[in-house]
Design a protein with these regions (language model features):
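ATP-binding glycine-rich phosphate-binding loop
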Residues: 1-19
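A conserved alpha-helical element in kinase catalytic cores
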Residues: 10-11, 23-63, 67, 76-99
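Active-site acidic catalytic loop and adjacent metal/ATP-binding pocket
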Residues: 13-17, 136-180
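Short hydrophobic-acidic sequence motifs that mark active-site Asp/Glu residues
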Residues: 16-25, 56, 68, 159, ...
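A glycine-centered beta->alpha junction motif in the catalytic cores
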Residues: 29, 65-84, 102-105, 121-122, ...
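Protein kinase-like catalytic domain
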Residues: 97, 101-104, 203
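An alpha-helical support segment within catalytic cores of ATP-dependent transferases
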Residues: 102-151, 161, 242
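Active-site activation/catalytic loop segments of kinase-like enzymes and analogous catalytic loops
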Residues: 179-206, 215-233, 242-246
């Protein structure tokens, strides 16, 4: 008998089929039609490169809305405490984030601005953001936007195997500043100032650059959650206040 363990992840659901040690990620077709997500076929070359570069397990696109992933079990659960208390492990993690930039930029194509625009495109709900799209573009370009980023770094997407780190879920892979990837990690894992400073020291990326992209992480989280949770969700309402303040103040 095939056993399925499922988990909903917004635009997609993830199923583990225990008979062949494979993980299947099934995408909601609405994410491509209504929210302008990139087609899975656009990721084939990215998946090939992440596997060859030892950044991730093998991914295989098997239909227009399903990918098959080789199951990867961590040696043990990675935690923020373990990551920041183990200097060697932190250096391995940051080296892997640098290695992401070895992916050919020509096959990534998507910019961080386009990622934002895919949510707000012709949507009257986001009128204020649309009105500031040129200022937003200028804000993003404060730092060079030519680094390949994972775009969704958090502990559930990071696996530790034989002192090697692998990343999962490349759906939000974009071209931006390297500070953006670390900002997203800091935002999603709620890092404190001391931990962000440590990231800065070991990565040689300024704290200023990392903090510069934190409002962008708030913005993306807000746009995503309004889709999957609705605007009446408590977290969405709190984020909306922060986003409104940020958008109002960019010039």
């Amino acid at each position: 008998m095939i056993t399925l363990n499922g988990q909903n992840e917004g635009f997609s659901s993830v199923y583990k089929i225990l008979t062949n040690q494979k993980v299947y990620k099934i995408y909601n077709q609405l994410s491509f039609a209504s929210y302008h997500r990139r087609k899975l076929s656009d990721f084939r070359k990215i998946y090939d490169q992440t596997y060859k570069l030892n950044l991730s397990p093998r991914h295989k696109v098997i239909s227009k809305n399903i990918i098959e992933i080789d199951e990867l079990n961590s040696d043990h659960q990675l935690t923020i405490k373990k990551l920041f208390n183990d200097e060697k492990l932190l250096k391995i993690f940051l080296a892997q984030t640098r290695k992401i930039n070895s992916i050919d930029k020509r096959i990534v194509k998507e910019s961080l601005l386009n990622e934002i625009y895919s949510y707000i495109y012709h949507n009257p709900k986001y009128y204020k953001i649309n009105q500031k799209i040129h200022q937003l573009k200028k804000y993003l370009k404060t730092y060079p936007q030519d680094f390949v980023c994972h775009g969704d770094l958090h502990l559930k997407n990071i696996y530790l195997k034989k002192n090697k780190i692998f990343f999962l879920d490349w759906d939000y892979c974009v071209l931006s500043s390297r500070g953006y990837d670390l900002a997203m990690f800091a935002y999603l894992e709620k890092l404190n100032e001391e931990q962000v400073n440590k990231l800065s020291i070991y990565s040689k990326i300024s704290v200023k650059e990392i903090f510069h992209y934190l409002p962008i992480c708030h913005l993306l989280d807000y746009l995503y959650l309004t889709i999957v949770s609705g605007r009446n969700d408590k977290k969405v309402k709190k984020l909306e206040l922060e986003v409104d303040k940020f958008i109002s103040n960019i010039h």
